[in-house]
């Protein structure tokens, strides 16, 4: 096959029904068309891939996929997709999702049509979409204590004590407000259909260059979501945090102390997501959010 891709990485979601059969179909398909296949070692350890399917494949750590592959295919749900996206963002390697989960905003190709949808993509017939990511730093006593990136959102939230937290928000060093609430969601357009949407935030079209600041149960009802350009730098000063944390895509977190500062900006590399040529963003929203359907 005359393809712009040569080395294809595969990441699988553990504890997923029929994942071995789906992986078998994909690996066999790629080998038959002459691609070099790289497998995430965790998927093998978790029994997601038949032993015989590993023959002739390279087995690597998920963090190495961006180093060796020019395309990564995710077999799973949006959670698996998010975890892989953060790992490969450094290398700017494109990613494509095959849905083995439930909602599937990011992993959109149905597994039953997987090879039919992938063949044109591997031949170079696809739609490419760039999504911005968040880069966050935790500043403690004037020094950077932690760094993290996220595709969906960075969420400052109260901890297990259940008490409201208090913090100040700045955008480009300009004071915005002091807020008492259960927390604050800083969302990308990709994350606008996730936690942000559940908290009352707006849906932003995926290619929009913006962030939203979405309060979580604010004490003041006048605290509403705010949209800002993605060229902005956001700073959050935690004044009364208790056992607050900052969560990234709901998968990793950093513990926060009083007077910690969290700075958030756009990550230097966008994530490049590939879609079949019949992909339509608003069609996806209609299907996933059940717009225009008779519900009763």
Curated annotation (Swiss-Prot):
EC number of the protein: 2.7.1.23
Any one of the GO BP annotations: NAD metabolic process
Active site annotation, chain numbering: 78 (proton acceptor)
Compartments (UniProt record): Cytoplasm
Catalytic activity: NAD(+) + ATP = ADP + NADP(+) + H(+)
Named cofactor requirement(s): a divalent metal cation
GO cellular component term, pick one: cytoplasm
Keywords: ATP-binding, Cytoplasm, Kinase, NAD, NADP, Nucleotide-binding, Transferase
InterPro entries: ATP-NAD_kinase_N, ATP-NAD_kinase_PpnK-typ_C, NAD/diacylglycerol_kinase_sf, NADK
Similarity comment text for this entry: Belongs to the NAD kinase family.
HAMAP family in the cross-refs: NAD_kinase
Protein function: Involved in the regulation of the intracellular balance of NAD and NADP, and is a key enzyme in the biosynthesis of NADP. Catalyzes specifically the phosphorylation on 2'-hydroxyl of the adenosine moiety of NAD to yield NADP.
Protein name: NAD kinase
Organism: Neisseria meningitidis serogroup B (strain ATCC BAA-335 / MC58)
């Amino acid at each position: 096959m005359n393809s712009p891709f040569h080395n294809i990485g595969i990441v699988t979601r553990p504890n997923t029904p029929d994942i071995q059969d789906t992986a078998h179909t994909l690996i066999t398909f790629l080998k038959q068309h002459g691609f070099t296949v790289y497998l995430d070692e965790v998927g093998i350890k978790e029994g997601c891939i038949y032993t015989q399917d590993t023959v002739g494949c390279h087995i690597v750590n998920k963090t190495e996929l961006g180093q060796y592959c020019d395309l990564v295919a995710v077999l799973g749900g949006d959670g698996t997709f998010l975890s892989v996206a953060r790992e490969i963002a450094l290398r700017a390697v494109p990613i494509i999702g095959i849905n083995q989960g439930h909602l599937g905003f990011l992993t959109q190709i149905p597994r039953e049509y997987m090879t039919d949808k992938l063949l044109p993509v591997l031949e170079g017939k696809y739609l490419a979409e760039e999504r911005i990511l968040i880069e966050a730093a935790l500043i403690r006593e004037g020094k950077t204590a932690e760094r993290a990136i996220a595709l969906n959102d960075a969420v400052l939230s109260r901890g297990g004590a259940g008490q409201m937290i208090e913090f100040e928000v700045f955008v480009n060093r300009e004071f915005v407000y002091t807020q008492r609430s259960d927390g604050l969601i800083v969302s990308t357009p990709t994350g606008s259909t996730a936690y942000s949407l559940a908290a009352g935030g707006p849906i932003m079209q995926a290619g929009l260059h913006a962030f939203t600041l979405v309060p979580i149960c604010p004490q003041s009802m006048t605290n509403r979501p705010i949209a800002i350009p993605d060229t902005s730098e956001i700073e959050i000063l935690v004044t009364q945090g208790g056992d607050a944390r900052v969560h990234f895509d709901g998968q990793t977190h950093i513990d926060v102390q009083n007077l910690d500062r969290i700075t958030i900006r756009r990550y230097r590399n966008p994530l490049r997501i590939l879609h079949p040529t019949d992909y339509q963003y608003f069609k996806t929203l209609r299907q996933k959010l059940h717009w225009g359907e008779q519900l009763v």
